């Protein structure tokens, strides 16, 4: 992903840009991840558009960036809390919420992952994480690098979901997918691939994550029956 960015798309990064992505008008601040330059965001937006969601469902969008995922799901009738560790991204997302007249349905908070919503639970959590391990060197770096981000996401997810809640997670072969799945499994979640897109040198996925007792009860019954044979 990074190589494609450097070779073909870097000229549109680092500038104040007005875009319309999947019909949603956006302003992209210079130091904020541009959702139109990489496939992870469109893939995640496609999964969001296909969701069956009750009006008024509570949704958390982690690492919101421009706020496009939060806006997309708010347009489906959800009430959304969006968080980002970057002060500039928070300003950008709040601007886009205003542009789309969604102040009554989307609030944007500054903080790392679940920290701004410590005791709150949601019907759906959305996360398009940074794929590379390490400490960001600048605000723009938070879109690319994070310290144990996926591990901390897996640990924090359970306490922030309602009993039948779920998560949508965008991941790539740029990370160790087996480690990601293992981390979620160790924290009581099973993953199901719902989107997949190949690009040269990389495959991007969207996983649906649900508590194991919901996703796996049918599998557990089948295993028990097989053991009795």
Task: Outline where the language-model segments fall.
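Conserved hydrophobic residues forming the short capping helix/wall of the S-adenosyl-L-methionine
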Residues: 97, 157, 184
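Class I S-adenosyl-L-methionine
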Residues: 173-180, 184-221
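Conserved SAM-binding loop and adjacent beta-strand
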Residues: 11, 29-48, 53
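Conserved beta-strand signature within the Rossmann-like core of class I S-adenosyl-L-methionine
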Residues: 164-171
């Amino acid at each position: 992903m990074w190589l494609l960015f450097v070779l073909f798309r870097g000229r549109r990064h680092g500038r104040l840009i007005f875009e319309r992505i999947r019909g949603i008008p956006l302003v992209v601040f210079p130091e904020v991840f541009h959702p139109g330059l990489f496939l992870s965001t469109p893939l995640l937006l496609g999964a969001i558009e296909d969701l069956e969601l009750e009006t008024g469902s509570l949704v958390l969008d982690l690492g919101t960036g421009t706020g496009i995922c939060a806006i997309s799901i708010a347009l489906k009738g959800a009430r959304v809390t969006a968080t980002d560790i970057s002060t500039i991204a928070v300003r950008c997302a709040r601007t886009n919420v205003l542009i789309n007249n969604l102040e009554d349905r989307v609030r944007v908070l500054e903080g790392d992952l679940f920290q701004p919503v410590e005791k709150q639970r949601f019907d759906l959590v959305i996360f398009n994480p940074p794929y590379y391990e390490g400490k960001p060197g600048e605000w723009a770096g938070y879109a690319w690098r994070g310290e144990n981000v996926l591990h901390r996401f897996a640990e924090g997810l359970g306490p922030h979901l309602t009993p039948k809640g779920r998560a949508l997670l965008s991941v790539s072969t740029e990370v160790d997918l087996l480690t990601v799945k293992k981390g979620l499994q160790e924290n009581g979640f099973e993953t199901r691939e719902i989107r997949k897109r190949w690009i040269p040198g990389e495959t991007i996925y969207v996983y649906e994550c649900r508590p194991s007792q919901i996703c796996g009860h049918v599998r557990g019954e089948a295993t028990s029956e097989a053991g009795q044979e």
